[in-house]
């Protein structure tokens, strides 16, 4: 059963100093937990409903909190100061972008750095994974939106090489401020990608064939966007504090816009309530509610049907920098069906330290003996005991080590002979080349 926003816990982060990441119950507006973040959080994401990953403002650091623990679990130092962060829905990958336009992808369980590549000419402003986790979508200050195949980025054989974008869209006139992906897959696994920009437009693309499906122009510069579960409505946040509700299933006829222009789409509605720029918009899974956050220090839970504010969630320290959603069953331990039971029985491993060094292509494993997650094989201790009891050492048993050494020496001698023969041929060809050059010089160059 899909969870609505009223069954979700809203994580609200602030970039202010000594401000915590506060978890609110969207149903009652009560504070559920406060996660320690001494330096604040410029952006955050949730990995598999188990860990909260945040980036510290003005620092080359990325922090990890367990959902069940309020204290900081792990802090990782990065090569550059991150400007955006995201995690795949299945919790397999974590990615970050920096102001230099560089992106990095880690394996979430071990912290191994899988790829580090130049994604944009200018800074990376926003990024997200597709619902299946097979592609990473990034947006930058250069106005470009790129989609990258995770399988190509994480290929060990291609480590250290320049990455090539799978899909690229460069239709925005100004920097991209937000990207999101639809949760409904079309034919062949096609996914809709939406981007918004300070040029007041939202653009909808097809990830399958790379075409631009639609463009919607709004009355003001946009900062964030979100799609509902059915991809029937697009929500975009503006710098003036308004949330624009844009129906996508209606006819794209041109009508008068909210500010008197002629380039808005018919049926656009503005949700008014915030007094400052919006920083994030999130949709519930069933599409009944949306949650918007603003720099005015408040997050509002809106009812989609009535377009009224249900709750106002206030962070102790403004401005708000980002929000994320976690199912409330993850906190209460009383899930619906098997979901809550699995979560209650599961034991999470310690949070890894995200590496800042990329393993070269020569090392296929990419892990040192002390790195990576622990692997437990049931029954291995019993098998070792049985093998040890059945092992008998015979000192007089014949061995084949001498024969193996003789074969190795013979193979080495053969290779050495072939090498000497090749070197002799090279010297012979050099001599022939020198004689030919001397002949040409005498007959053609020095001839009267």
Report residues per predicted region:
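Residue-level detector of Asp-centered blade-edge/turn motifs that repeat once per structural unit
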Residues: 3-6, 47-49, 89-90, 131-132, ...
């Amino acid at each position: 059963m899909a969870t609505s926003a009223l069954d979700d816990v809203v994580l609200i982060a602030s970039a202010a100093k000594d401000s915590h990441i506060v978890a609110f119950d969207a149903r009652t507006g009560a504070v559920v937990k406060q996660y320690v973040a001494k330096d604040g959080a410029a952006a955050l994401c949730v990995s598999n409903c188990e860990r909260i990953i945040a980036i510290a403002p003005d620092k080359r650091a990325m922090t990890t909190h367990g959902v069940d623990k309020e204290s900081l679990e792990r802090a990782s130092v990065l090569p550059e100061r991150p400007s955006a962060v995201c995690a795949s829905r299945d919790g397999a990958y974590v990615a970050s972008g920096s102001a230099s336009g560089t992106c990095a992808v880690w394996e979430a369980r071990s912290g191994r750095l899988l790829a580090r590549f130049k994604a944009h000419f200018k800074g990376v402003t926003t990024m997200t994974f597709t619902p299946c986790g097979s592609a990473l979508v990034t947006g930058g200050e250069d106005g470009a939106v790129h989609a990258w195949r995770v399988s190509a980025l994480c290929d060990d054989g291609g480590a250290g090489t320049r990455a090539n974008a799978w899909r690229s869209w460069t239709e925005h006139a100004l920097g991209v401020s937000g990207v999101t992906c639809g949760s409904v897959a079309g034919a062949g696994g096609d996914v809709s990608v939406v981007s918004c920009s300070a040029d007041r437009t939202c653009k909808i693309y097809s990830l399958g064939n790379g075409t631009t499906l639609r463009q919607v122009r709004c009355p003001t510069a946009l900062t964030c966007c979100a799609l509902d579960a059915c991809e029937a409505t697009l929500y975009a946040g503006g710098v003036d504090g308004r949330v624009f509700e844009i129906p996508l299933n209606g006819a794209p006829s041109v009508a008068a816009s909210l500010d008197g222009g002629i380039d808005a789409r018919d049926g656009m509605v503005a949700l008014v309530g915030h007094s400052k720029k919006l920083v994030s918009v999130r949709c519930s899974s069933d599409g009944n509610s949306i949650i918007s956050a603003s720099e005015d220090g408040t997050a509002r839970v809106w009812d989609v049907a009535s377009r009224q504010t249900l709750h106002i969630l206030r962070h102790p320290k403004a401005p708000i920098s980002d929000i994320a959603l976690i199912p409330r069953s993850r906190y209460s331990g009383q899930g619906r069906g098997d979901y809550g039971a699995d979560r209650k029985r599961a034991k999470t491993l310690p949070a890894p330290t995200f590496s800042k060094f990329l393993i070269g292509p020569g090392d296929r494993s990419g892990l040192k003996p002390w790195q990576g997650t622990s692997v437990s094989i049931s029954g291995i201790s019993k098998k070792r005991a049985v093998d040890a009891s059945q092992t008998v050492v015979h000192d007089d048993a014949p061995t084949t080590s001498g024969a193996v050494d003789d074969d190795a020496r013979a193979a080495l001698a053969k290779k050495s002979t072939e090498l000497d023969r090749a070197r002799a041929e090279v010297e012979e060809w050099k001599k022939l080349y020198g004689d030919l050059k001397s002949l040409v010089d005498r007959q053609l160059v020095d001839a009267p």
